[in-house]
From Swiss-Prot:
Transmembrane segments: none
High-level lineage: Bacteria, Pseudomonadati, Pseudomonadota, Gammaproteobacteria, Enterobacterales
Keyword Chaperone in annotation: yes
Keywords from the UniProt entry: ATP-binding, Chaperone, Cytoplasm, Nucleotide-binding
Single annotated GO MF: proteasome-activating activity
Protein name as it appears in the record: ATP-dependent protease ATPase subunit HslU
Binding positions for ATP per the UniProt entry: 18, 60-65, 256, 322, 394
Example GO BP: protein unfolding
Source species: Klebsiella pneumoniae subsp. pneumoniae (strain ATCC 700721 / MGH 78578)
Assembly with partners or alone: A double ring-shaped homohexamer of HslV is capped on each side by a ring-shaped HslU homohexamer. The assembly of the HslU/HslV complex is dependent on binding of ATP.
Localization of this protein: Cytoplasm
PANTHER family membership: ATP-DEPENDENT CLP PROTEASE ATP-BINDING SUBUNIT CLPX-LIKE, MITOCHONDRIAL-RELATED, ATP-DEPENDENT PROTEASE ATPASE SUBUNIT HSLU
Similarity field: Belongs to the ClpX chaperone family. HslU subfamily.
Amino acid sequence: MSEMTPREIVSELDKHIIGQDAAKRSVSIALRNRWRRMQLNEELRHEVTPKNILMIGPTGVGKTEIARRLAKLANAPFIKVEATKFTEVGYVGKEVDSIIRDLTDAAIKMVRMQSIDKNRYRAEEMAEERILDVLIPPAKNNWGQAEQPQEPSAARQAFRKKLREGQLDDKEIEIDLAAAPMGVEIMSPPGMEEMTSQLQSMFQNLGGQKQKPRKLKIKDAMKLLIEEEAAKLVNPEELKQEAIDAVEQHGIVFIDEIDKICKRGGNASGPDVSREGVQRDLLPLVEGCTVSTKHGMVKTDHILFIASGAFQVASPSDLIPELQGRLPIRVELKALTTHDFERILTEPNASITVQYKALMATEGVNIEFTEDGIKRIAQAAWQVNETTENIGARRLHTVLERLVEDISYDASEMNGQTVTIDAEYVSKHLDVLVADEDLSRFIL
């Protein structure tokens, strides 16, 4: 679990997301409160529940990007789901309980990787011994079993030194590796994914673990052997329990597009299989219940839920009152301005302009963006958003792709050339499209 302070979390988010300070502060405080809660005594810790967050803002302003970056910072079980993927219990489609099952699967994977990393040094030693056994087979006793000498021979030590120095990396050896489990593909009817998963696990475990000889270079064999030996050092039961504890105490669920499961203006009629019904099914999860998974029972009382939506047609008040009450912290994300677009093009660590420069550099083409060129690109994107659909920062991708289309096409024949993208270049390539609303609607 991350021990970063709210200021450190915001600073890290600032490297990738421009503006939206209120949203960054809210998620950073929520993340820090997870750590604060774990410092309390057990009795009080049980009483402190997370304050769930509802992020409201137009499309393309950074809601989903905040979730993506938060997942990397949290160092905790994290899952992002789309609210529109679920239907009410009893109908064809995914049930909301599958959110917790998927979160538990993510936790199992995360804890397994942590456990493998913890045992990596010991696994490396064991993998090294297995390779040395192939290079210098140990002497065998009368029953054909390998004898373990009290001290390694001089030849074995010499090979060990060469192995560690990488002198034997390209030498081919034949070594026994665990065979991949039998793959059984089962087409699952909607809503029965859990049963299908259990059937697949059962078929994969049939016949036990088998060894299969493979011919590999030593450097490739070493990687596979380290993974295999590290996996042997992991206790499956301890791993399951640790993963379930991680989900219950530190789990974070990000529910995107929650506005799409609202009744539009509260006046929709007819069956609401994937709208109000889903909201009612979400209630127990958000409030706290116990969900059965293939790894064990998982309590959701202390899982943090962050919901987000554009709310362009519906409004937050169109959510059912019970769900509104369980999302007490409201954060509004602001629409992006021309100045925000300029900052998005230049400030993030891997901004779009940096990406295009790097892509073209692979073919020996140097692209330079001038300050007035950046301003003109930002103005063009903002203008198209205003006159057509406002899709936020995503419009920059469309505009830039159109702008460098000719360079991308001819890059292989432009080795060593420098292309300067200034205001004049941008105007030449985009002005006609931006001015014509019909063209910009279909092309930009």
